[in-house]
């Protein structure tokens, strides 16, 4: 299954929900999560012995897990692909740019009466071209990598909160702030259908310790990456816990995938063999770069 088919899948669920449950008070809520630079070899649900992802494993066990999900080998094409449901042949413009005039899945949800939010990595707007979260159909946003924010995505994060850039203090961790924002959005909209799009900044480099790392000063890239994957799993768990607490879990579709494979600077266990990651800043297309979780 490719990333654009993921879009088609959950839009089909939306349309089915609209027609079948039109007379009912509840439509399905949707939480769509896209992790950043992590291949399927990094998940214990896929058999990894190096990584621990218990919350995602539980999602896979309770729902569906796909063995063959393939992304594009670079992040922007995957993001454009996912948000429009179209092959990049038809609408890819350039790295870090979303094509103006292309409708996104957020617009389809808004047309069905959904509240919409995006929180995480944007990277679809430059000072010259692209679109903002609002232009993409999101009512609310808390995003990094948009004109006005600085380069800090983890500690001391620089994030745009609903149009205002906030440079957080050194004790703040970006992924925690973003998860907090989405949880607040869910709580605010608990009585109406909502779409929460969560393009995570984890576990993209720089590979630094997380708030849950045993060694807060670690310089070991692989060790820190493993911790970042664990924190990614923790953030997903926090979102699900909020849904459970609010009594919304059974009425919420959660989808988790990734934009591309693991960073090529890392050597990891690839189901019995040691291989470098293959996030394709090179042209060597391989399963390590294209195979992602779903």
Question: Where do the language-model regions lie?
Answer:
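Single conserved hydrophobic/aromatic residue that forms the stacking wall/gate
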Residues: 281-294
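Formylglycine-dependent sulfatase
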Residues: 2-5, 10, 19-283
């Amino acid at each position: 299954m490719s990333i654009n088919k993921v879009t088609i899948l959950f839009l089909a669920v939306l349309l089915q929900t609209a027609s079948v449950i039109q007379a009912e008070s509840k439509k399905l809520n949707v939480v769509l999560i896209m992790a950043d630079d992590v291949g399927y070899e990094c998940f214990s649900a896929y058999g990894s012995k190096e990584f621990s992802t218990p919350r995602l494993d539980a999602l896979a066990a309770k729902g569906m897990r796909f063995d063959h999900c393939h992304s594009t080998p670079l992040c922007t094409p995957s993001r454009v692909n996912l948000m429009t449901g179209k092959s990049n042949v038809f609408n890819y413009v350039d790295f870090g740019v979303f094509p103006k005039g292309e409708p996104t899945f957020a617009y389809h949800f808004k047309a069905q009466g959904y509240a919409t939010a995006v929180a995480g990595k944007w990277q679809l707007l430059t000072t010259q071209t692209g679109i903002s979260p609002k232009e993409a159909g999101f009512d609310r946003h808390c995003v990094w990598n948009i004109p006005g924010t600085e380069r800090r995505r983890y500690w001391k994060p620089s994030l745009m909160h609903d149009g205002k850039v906030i440079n957080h203090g050194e004790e703040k961790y970006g992924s925690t702030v973003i998860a907090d924002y989405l949880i607040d959005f869910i709580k605010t909209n608990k009585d109406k259908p909502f779409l929460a799009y969560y393009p995570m900044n984890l576990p993209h480099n720089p590979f630094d310790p997380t708030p849950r790392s045993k060694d807060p000063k670690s310089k070991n890239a692989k060790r820190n990456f493993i911790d970042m994957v664990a924190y990614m799993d923790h953030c997903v768990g926090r979102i699900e816990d909020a849904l459970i607490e609010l009594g919304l879990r059974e009425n919420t579709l959660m989808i988790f995938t990734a934009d591309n494979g693991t960073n090529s600077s890392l050597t990891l266990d690839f189901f019995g063999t040691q291989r470098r990651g293959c996030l394709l800043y090179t042209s060597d297309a391989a399963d390590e770069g294209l195979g992602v979780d779903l």
